[in-house]
């Protein structure tokens, strides 16, 4: 819902939406394993993902490992390093079982992909993107598309959730670290090179960013009703800083980006007004839902075109 990837990629290539289906199931499976519940959800989700598409299965594997690592330290802390080997063995066994289930289709596809000219080709990977990429980066998170399949286009209200997250001091450290890390992936071409199978630079993994944004917003939603005055001031500072940095470069001040930032300002001020201008939780719920719907419709309007196969 939050990701422009859903609107853009699923229209152009429907199977590009597959990883957005499998990733939540795999992550739920990881949580079940940590709770010492049955591993069936994890095994079958990984197996079906492997049967579906090797290209996205590779990316899913990377984010699966990252999530498992983050969840481990969140649940057990750094003082439980002695248990790392045990959990590595558990996940290795279940992952091997899943891969063996998918092997009848997965292995032939892997051999075919490894033999293609595209995979064997040597690709130039720059250290940084062009200057304009960084000038438009912040605004493009909720606005227009980036280069190299960097289709973010998140609903503006989800960025409000990010402000709330970082306003909460000494809480949600794992989510904060994950958010910073995934932005670093977008800022350096080498990450796009690695996540694209060490081929040319492409950010077709950005659907995982959308998953993180959605998860953060869901976690922050209850916090919207319990913000202290100090936290509201911090959120206001974040909002002002984002608006200035996002729209300061001339290249970033496009119509789509300006409207997206306007929606962000309205959504954030609505959240900050709760408890002062209005006090009914239902009103905030309705307005937050309204901004979410408007953000989705806004992205659809600017993303689709009546030309070029309905893609802008």
Identify the residue ranges that each predicted region occupies.
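Periplasmic/ER-lumenal interhelical loops and adjacent helix-loop junctions
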Residues: 87-203, 250-256
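Short hydrophobic alpha-helices at membrane interfaces in multi-pass membrane enzymes
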Residues: 33-48, 80-92, 229-241
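Membrane-interface micro-motifs in multi-pass membrane enzymes
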Residues: 1-27, 34, 50-60, 145-158, ...
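Contiguous transmembrane helix-bundle modules in multi-pass membrane proteins
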Residues: 37, 56, 177-186, 196, ...
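Membrane-interface alpha helices of multi-pass inner-membrane proteins
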Residues: 29, 40-54, 97-100, 241-243
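C-terminal TM-helix exit segments that contain a strictly Trp-centered aromatic cap at the helix terminus
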Residues: 60, 101-112, 298-306
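Perimembrane helix-loop-helix junctions
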Residues: 60-96, 266-273
């Amino acid at each position: 819902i939050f990701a422009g990837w859903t609107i853009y990629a699923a229209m152009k290539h429907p199977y590009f939406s597959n990883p957005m289906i499998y990733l939540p199931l795999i992550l739920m499976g990881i949580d079940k394993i940590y709770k010492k519940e049955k591993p069936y959800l994890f095994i079958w989700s990984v197996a079906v993902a492997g049967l579906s598409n090797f290209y996205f299965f590779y990316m899913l594997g990377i984010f699966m490992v990252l999530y498992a690592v983050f969840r481990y330290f969140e649940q057990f802390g750094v003082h439980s390093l002695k248990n790392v080997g045990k959990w590595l063995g558990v996940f290795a066994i279940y992952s091997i079982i899943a891969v063996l289930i998918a092997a009848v289709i997965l292995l032939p596809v892997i051999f075919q992909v490894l033999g293609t000219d595209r995979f064997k080709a040597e690709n130039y990977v720059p250290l940084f993107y062009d200057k304009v990429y960084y000038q438009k980066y912040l605004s493009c998170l909720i606005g227009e598309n980036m280069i190299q399949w960097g289709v973010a286009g998140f609903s503006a209200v989800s960025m409000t959730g990010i402000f709330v997250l970082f306003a909460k001091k000494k809480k949600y450290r794992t989510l904060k670290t994950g958010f910073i890390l995934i932005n670093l992936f977008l800022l350096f071409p080498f990450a796009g090179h690695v996540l694209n199978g060490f081929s040319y630079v492409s950010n077709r993994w950005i659907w995982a960013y959308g998953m993180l944004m959605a998860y953060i917003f869901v976690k922050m939603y209850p916090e919207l009703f319990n913000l202290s005055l100090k936290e509201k001031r911090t959120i206001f500072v974040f909002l002002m800083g984002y608006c200035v940095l996002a729209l300061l470069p001339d290249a970033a001040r496009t119509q789509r980006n300006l409207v997206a930032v306007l929606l962000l300002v309205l959504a954030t001020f609505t959240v900050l007004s709760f408890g002062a201008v209005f006090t009914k939780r239902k009103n905030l719920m309705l307005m937050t839902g309204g901004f979410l719907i408007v953000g989705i419709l806004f992205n659809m309007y600017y993303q689709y075109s009546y030309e070029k196969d309905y893609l802008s």
